[in-house]
């Protein structure tokens, strides 16, 4: 009986360790991905005034 209980605890322990490792790995990767998305958003936000200016220039040329 004791050996069966020990085997059960060891098995659950391995799954718990694996689950914890995968959980923290996924959280870390998601954090990296979020940082990349924030950088992309910043770059696009910086480009927006230039795009707006170009669109206004095109509108002016079309209205002439």
From Swiss-Prot:
Leader sequence residues: 1-16
Record bears the keyword Signal: yes
Alphabetized UniProt keyword annotations: Antibiotic, Antimicrobial, Bacteriocin, Plasmid, Signal
Top-level taxon in the UniProt lineage: Bacteria
Keyword RNA-binding assigned: no
Biological process (GO), any one: defense response to bacterium
UniProt xrefs under InterPro entries: Phage_BhlA/UviB (IPR024405)
UniProt cross-references to Pfam families, sorted A to Z: Holin_BhlA
Induction pattern: By UV irradiation.
Known function: May have a role in bacteriocin secretion or immunity.
This protein's name: Bacteriocin UviB
Gene source species: Clostridium perfringens
């Amino acid at each position: 009986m004791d050996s069966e209980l020990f085997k059960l605890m060891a098995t659950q322990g391995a799954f718990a360790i694996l689950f914890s490792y995968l959980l923290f790995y996924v959280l870390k990767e998601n954090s990296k991905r979020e940082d990349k998305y924030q950088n992309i958003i910043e770059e696009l936000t910086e480009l927006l005034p230039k795009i707006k200016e170009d669109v206004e220039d095109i509108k002016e040329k079309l209205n002439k």
